[in-house]
Swiss-Prot record:
Its cofactor is pyridoxal 5'-phosphate. Keywords: Aminotransferase, Pyridoxal phosphate, Transferase. Belongs to the class-I pyridoxal-phosphate-dependent aminotransferase family. Its EC number is 2.6.1.-. One of its GO terms (molecular function) is aromatic-amino-acid transaminase activity. Gene3D superfamilies: Type I PLP-dependent aspartate aminotransferase-like (Major domain). It is an enzyme of class 2 (transferase). It comes from the Eukaryota. This is Aminotransferase swnA. GO terms for biological process: aromatic amino acid family catabolic process; lysine biosynthetic process via aminoadipic acid; tyrosine biosynthetic process. The keyword Transport does not apply. CDD domains: AAT_like.
């Protein structure tokens, strides 16, 4: 069976290599228009429209009308007249950064007022340019809009595309926020098997080829976290993405690419921010980043979600979504009557940082600094795992992106293991989790992320970015190792 699986996988990859030029997709020309997705829209999308009251504000006129139509308090009633922000030394920003009444580009009166659902024009333009430079989507009519973070964006996209009772596709282990959002909307999740490169193309193709349409219509939304996958830390290779994209084309899937860890690379050199010619720091960054589904997308079937939460601060509640203009327009209609655009003060902070202070070069330097810090922490945690987790019982893979280690514990090594004990994995997970907490370390249970129960292994996710103290990385792993060893009655080091 395993050999048949590998042969099928090899055939699929050969098929992909014949149809997708992995190296040149970025620069293929001429670019076509995106597909239309009317046949993939939910009932809610078909009934959703733009707010006529808010649209009235956008109506172009030759002069500024007297504003008596929309209930927007005039700026003279706001209790603030300026904002001042000071960046850290590592951010290398122009300090202080201020926002006052009457500033030409983005004054505080605009920041504190209701805003267009796409967000600040200047800030959106910055993220759109970043997307063009890094991903260069190979079709014409793509666009970018702001979001209130990835979780909010994913929630809206699921509402846009799916009706209650539908199924979506996702990795066998995936982000809990998406699982909860799907369940809240009455959706089911079909798990797709994974290997050391992430999603398995053959399993995805087989699940779709042999889907039982008597239970529901065939899934057409694939949710994936391709870089520094949460929770496993896996990063999909370009060849793997190309294989998955080929299947998406074959089965007319929409790919929801959730990529908050894309910029957090953990391999390479981070020793200096001074980049010698011929490459700028941004160009060097671009060449070091993984490919994306968006960069392979010729038909507009990828909906890419980026976030500032993992690279700046989660409290900003701001990110950006890139997709075909049709999808972006529908997304903005949903956002307008839902979460609306991100907070105005958050947009001001990002505008001052990205547009007025950093630019693309400064952004690249910041990511270089952040990735270097995270790489050092990852290396400390990997060394601690090698020293303190029971050998032969615990395994893990060194991540090349992101912020997580996925610890796998072999359940068959437990003295009470029996194939007939269906609940042993969850029972043991609970005991290790509680014992670790009693020893003073908090970890994440693997079952929180698993779409379907795993009966022969126990998993825990740990992160190397949450603590401010480097010593906590080794001490935390040491305490987790003690909890595992005690629950397994394991005396070997």
């Amino acid at each position: 069976m395993h050999l048949e699986f590998e042969k099928a996988h090899d055939v699929l990859l050969e098929d992909v290599r014949d149809t997708v030029n992995i190296r040149q997709t970025h620069f293929s020309s001429p670019k076509r228009l995106a597909n239309r997705w009317d046949h993939r829209l939910s009932d809610e999308s078909l009934s959703q429209g733009a707010s006529p009251l808010k649209n009235s504000v956008k109506t172009a006129t030759t002069s500024v009308p007297i504003p008596l139509g929309v209930g927007r308090p005039a700026s003279l009633f706001y209790p603030w007249q300026s904002m001042t922000m000071t960046g850290t030394k590592e951010s290398n920003t122009r300090n202080p950064m201020t926002c006052n009444i009457g500033e030409a580009a983005f004054d505080i009166s605009s920041a504190l007022n209701y805003a267009d659902p796409s967000g600040s024009t200047e800030l959106v333009a910055c993220f759109r340019e970043n997307t063009r430079l890094i991903h260069n989507p190979p079709y014409q009519d793509w666009d970018t809009t702001l979001t209130c973070g990835s979780t909010s964006a994913i929630d809206i996209v699921l509402r846009m595309l799916c009706n209650r009772g539908d199924w979506i596709l996702a990795e066998a282990s995936t982000y809990t926020g998406t699982v909860m959002a799907a369940k809240a909307h009455g959706l089911n999740i079909q798990s797709i098997e994974m290997d050391e490169e992430g999603l398995l193309p053959v399993d995805l193709d087989n699940k779709l080829r042999y889907w039982d349409t008597s239970r529901s219509r065939k899934p057409f939304v694939l949710y994936t976290i391709p870089s520094g996958h949460n929770p496993t830390g896996i990063t999909q290779s370009t060849a793997r993405k190309a294989a998955i994209y080929q299947i998406a084309e074959r089965h007319d899937l929409l790919v929801l690419e959730d990529d908050p860890y894309f910029f957090l690379r953990l391999d390479g050199s981070f020793s200096s921010l001074d980049i010698n010619p011929p490459y700028s720091s941004f160009e060097k960054l671009r060449k070091s980043l993984p490919s994306s589904y968006l960069s392979l997308d010729k038909s507009g079937r990828v909906i890419r979600v980026d976030s500032t939460s993992k690279i700046l601060a989660p409290g900003l509640r701001c990110g950006w979504l890139t997709a075909s203009k049709q999808i972006v327009e529908i997304f903005e209609n949903f956002a307008e009557v839902g979460p609306a655009p991100p907070s105005g003060p958050s947009q001001v902070m990002l505008y001052k940082l990205f547009v007025e202070s950093w630019g693309q070069e400064g952004f690249a330097n910041w990511l270089n600094h952040l990735s270097g810090e995270y790489k050092s922490r990852r290396d400390i945690m990997i060394a601690a795992c090698s020293q303190h987790l029971p050998k032969g019982l615990c395994t893990w893979t060194t991540p090349t992106h992101g912020m997580f280690l996925w610890i796998t514990i072999d359940l068959a090594r437990h003295p009470d293991y029996s194939e007939k004990r269906e609940n042993l994995s969850l029972d043991l997970e609970d005991k290790i989790y509680e014992r670790a907490a009693s020893y003073g370390v908090a970890v994440a249970k693997g079952s929180w992320f698993n779409v379907e129960a795993c009966l022969d292994k126990v998993f825990f996710r740990i992160t190397f970015v949450s603590t401010t103290c480097l010593d906590d990385l080794e001490n935390g792993v040491k305490r987790l190792g003690a909890a595992v060893r005690d629950e397994f009655r394991f005396t070997q080091a």
